[in-house]
């Protein structure tokens, strides 16, 4: 035989439970914390293919990375379809020593039945860059309770109809994103805010609007879509 060096495994795995799929690759947040490694986390929720094409399913991805070099430590994903594809891509990125700076530029086959013009993996890269470039500051779902107890206010920028379909069980200031610029006077610049929407895109836009207007604000990473999955007891429905 030919002598070849085994470079080891990064622990890529997948499991199906009924109609849901969960997969992971690389290091988890728990392992990073146990080893005292510096890291940042970003969550992105998207569709397995173009949302306007029939049959699109939600895919939620989590990326862990080193905040200075952008080294990708690991990733996890959950959803009904398309999770295997994204985790396989991210596992290949880790093995190939790609960083978060490479993810927005990755190119995939595209047609509406198969993917989106910007794949959720691309969006992970953009969201991670927003953090390391100082355009965004986020908090994780498990930090929300302590942040609110410390005096921060929760701002939801979804529509009124979205709030009726589910909201967090916290004291909430509600201003839809399309009304935010006109209603900035209703907010207190001496107050710190945590902003949220459904999946994180609109709350990022709101965060940028508020910061440019002189407010102190952080984005709830993963927003409502993630929170209702990981802490369903913290969500209420109806009026």
Where are these regions (language model features)?
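Surface-exposed charge patches
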Residues: 30-34, 91, 161, 208
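Short, conserved beta-strand edge motifs with alternating hydrophobic and charged residues
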Residues: 42-43, 154-157
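A short, polar/charged loop-to-alpha-helix boundary motif
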Residues: 81-100
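Generic non-transmembrane alpha-helix signal with a bias for helix starts/N-cap capping motifs
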Residues: 25-26, 86, 203
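Generic secondary-structure signature for well-ordered alpha-helical cores
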Residues: 1-4, 37, 95-99, 108
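Rhodanese-like catalytic fold shared by cysteine-dependent sulfurtransferases
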Residues: 101-112, 116-153, 160-192, 198-239
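Mid-to-C-terminal Rossmann-like scaffold of FAD/NAD(P)H-dependent oxidoreductases
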Residues: 1-79, 116, 120-146
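Short beta->alpha junction loops/turns
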Residues: 21, 79-80, 96, 199-200
């Amino acid at each position: 035989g030919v002598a070849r060096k085994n470079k080891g495994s990064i622990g890529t795995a997948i499991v199906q439970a009924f109609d849901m799929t969960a997969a992971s690759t690389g290091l988890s947040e728990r392992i990073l914390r146990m080893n005292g490694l510096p890291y940042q986390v970003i969550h992105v929720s998207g569709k397995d293919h173009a949302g306007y094409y029939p049959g699109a399913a939600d895919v939620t991805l989590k990326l862990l990375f080193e905040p200075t070099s952008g080294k990708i430590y690991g990733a996890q994903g959950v959803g009904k379809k398309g999770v295997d594809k994204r985790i396989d891509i991210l596992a290949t990125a880790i093995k190939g020593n790609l960083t978060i700076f490479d993810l927005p530029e990755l190119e995939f086959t595209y047609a509406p039945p198969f993917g989106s013009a910007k794949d959720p993996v691309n969006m992970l890269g953009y969201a991670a860059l927003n953090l390391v470039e100082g355009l965004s500051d986020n908090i994780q779902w498990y930090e929300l309770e302590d942040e609110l107890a410390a005096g921060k206010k929760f701002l939801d920028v979804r529509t009124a109809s979205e709030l009726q379909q589910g909201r967090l069980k916290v004291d909430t200031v509600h201003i839809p994103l399309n009304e935010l610029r006109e209603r900035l006077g209703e907010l207190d610049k001496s107050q710190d805010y945590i902003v949220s929407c459904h999946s994180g895109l609109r709350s990022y836009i709101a965060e940028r609007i508020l910061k440019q207007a002189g407010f102190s604000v952080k984005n709830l990473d993963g927003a409502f879509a993630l929170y209702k999955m990981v802490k369903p007891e913290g969500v209420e429905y109806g009026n």
